[in-house]
């Protein structure tokens, strides 16, 4: 396996402006929609990481303690999900067959814990907000030839990226190469 590398930042023109083609996904074909989201997450991961970082920095500037608490709770919830999936076959099957439900459960547990701790609004704006915007963009953005080539290189293992490792941990490795 090659070393993990962050891909280059995609041009703003490619990401959201001029050449960016956006279209609503077909809700009747959820598998194709899932492939589009996963492939866009892999291709634009550096741009998404930057957007997430900016959102987190803004929330951290306004409410630093609640932002740190939000990040810690979500990280622990994701860690528990990955650990449970690695040690328990039933959880692994559930995670692979219902990835959206597992992600929603992690976010719901995070929101519940933070609601009890008083940081629910900060969680919604600092973590859930940017994640929602990233998923909306990944759903709407149509793939181009360059995107498809980069994803094939990732899927055959010639290049490893942080998003590829995250998708693998969430049980989406079989989807990522499609």
Curated annotation (Swiss-Prot):
One GO cellular component term: postsynapse
Membrane protein topology class: Multi-pass membrane protein
Transmembrane segments: 42-62, 65-85, 97-119, 123-140
The keyword Chaperone is annotated on this UniProt entry: no
Tissue specificity as recorded in UniProt: Strong expression in the brain, small intestine, lung, spleen, and pancreas as well as in tumor tissues of the breast, colon, lung and ovary, with a weaker expression in normal tissues of the same patient. High expression in neuroblastic tumors. Strongly expressed in Purkinje cells and more moderately in cells of the molecular and the granular layers in the cerebellum. Detected in neuronal cells, but not in non-neuronal cells in the cerebral cortex, hippocampus, and lateral ventricles.
Stored InterPro entries: Prenylated_rab_accept_PRA1
Keyword set, alphabetical order: Endosome, Membrane, Protein transport, Transmembrane, Transmembrane helix, Transport
Cytoplasmic topological intervals: 1-41, 86-96, 141-178
Ranges facing Extracellular side: 63-64, 120-122
Source superkingdom: Eukaryota
Presence of keyword Ribonucleoprotein: no
Localization terms from the record: Endosome membrane
Any single GO BP term: protein transport
A Pfam short name: PRA1
Family under the similarity heading: Belongs to the PRA1 family.
Subunit structure as annotated in this protein's UniProt entry: Interacts with CCR5 and GDE1.
Function: May be involved in ER/Golgi transport and vesicular traffic. Plays a proapoptotic role in cerulenin-induced neuroblastoma apoptosis.
Protein name: PRA1 family protein 2
Organism the protein comes from: Homo sapiens
């Amino acid at each position: 396996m090659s070393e993990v590398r962050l891909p280059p930042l995609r041009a703003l023109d490619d990401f959201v402006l001029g050449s960016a083609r956006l279209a609503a996904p077909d809700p009747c074909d959820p598998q194709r929609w899932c492939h589009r989201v996963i492939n866009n997450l892999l291709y634009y991961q550096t741009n998404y990481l930057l957007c997430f970082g900016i959102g987190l920095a803004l929330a951290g500037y306004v409410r630093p303690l609640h932002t740190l608490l939000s990040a810690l709770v979500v990280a622990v919830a994701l860690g528990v999900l990955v650990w449970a999936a690695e040690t328990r076959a039933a959880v692994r099957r559930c995670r692979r067959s219902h990835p959206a439900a597992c992600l929603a459960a992690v976010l719901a547990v995070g929101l519940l814990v933070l609601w009890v701790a008083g940081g629910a609004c900060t969680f919604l704006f600092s973590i859930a907000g940017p994640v929602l915007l990233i998923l909306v963009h990944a759903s709407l953005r149509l793939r181009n030839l360059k995107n498809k080539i980069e994803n094939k290189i990732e899927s055959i293992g010639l290049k490893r990226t942080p998003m590829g490792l995250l998708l693998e941990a969430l049980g989406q490795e079989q989807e990522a190469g499609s």
